[in-house]
UniProtKB/Swiss-Prot annotation:
ATP binds at P93, I94, S95, A96, G97, L98, A99, G100, G101, S102, S103. It catalyses: 4-CDP-2-C-methyl-D-erythritol + ATP = 4-CDP-2-C-methyl-D-erythritol 2-phosphate + ADP + H(+). InterPro entries: GHMP_kinase_C_dom, GHMP_kinase_C_sf, GHMP_kinase_N_dom, IspE, Ribosomal_Su5_D2-typ_SF, Ribsml_uS5_D2-typ_fold_subgr. Catalyzes the phosphorylation of the position 2 hydroxy group of 4-diphosphocytidyl-2C-methyl-D-erythritol. This is 4-diphosphocytidyl-2-C-methyl-D-erythritol kinase. One of its GO terms (biological process) is isopentenyl diphosphate biosynthetic process, methylerythritol 4-phosphate pathway. The keyword Hydrolase does not apply. GO terms for molecular function: 4-(cytidine 5'-diphospho)-2-C-methyl-D-erythritol kinase activity; ATP binding. Its EC number is 2.7.1.148.
Amino acid sequence: MMKINSYAKINLSLDVLDLREDGYHNIDTIMNLIDLHDVIEINRNNTNELKLSSNNSNFPTDKTNLIYKIFENLKKFRKINCSYDVFVDKQIPISAGLAGGSSNACEFLMYVNDDLSLNLSNQEIKEICRLTGADTFYFTSKKCVRATGIGNEFVRLSDFSNKNIIIVNNGMSISSKDVYDNLKESNGGLGKITVAIDSRDYETFYRKAFNTMESVSERLVEEISDIKEQLNNLGCDLSLMSGSGPTVFGIFENYNDYENCYSKLKDKYKYVFKTKTL
């Protein structure tokens, strides 16, 4: 049995651009991993059936799961004569804007590639991930990146690790499609924000960071704006929604404010995590 950590990501800024012919949207985003993670246990079996299970009853174990989808997409590139039993110990909230499902899928793909000595090229991995989900390929990077296209074209940015992060999620989920369908025009990209974070001008970055999906998601889940306000009042340097939400994160340069915020919010919402960027 192999155990693999599968990390969540946050969007340090996110702008949604135009709709593509393939149904995806072009985006401009800055992403970074955080230490919040699921643990995936993988055992090879000699059947033709991929068996998924989890400690979370809301975790899909059917063909809608991205682990299943990425395994099927892998078979378009290589002949596979075995399958796997996969148990996911879920710590990352589901459908929360933290890409837990995409992370699970990518980690599974990379494990199978190694386990079966498939020798997939980077381009093959990129295409398998594209067929599976827009942000899946990011998890091969594991760095602070500016991502464009559908989120699969990367420029690595300066290290943004070891930042104090509070994650807050009220237990609700949001359909990304519902948010995308109600978006208006973009903010014109992340040029200045990218320069700020890459030059470690965090004061400018914290002031200019944005997520164009927030305005739509806040109408669907009103508590998002309330959580942001509480994080701001408790001393965070930046509060922002991740992805399409409803998860909100706060970045704290001051460690005492970070600890105090966690203490004040940890019993107030369904999911409150104290974590760091990787």
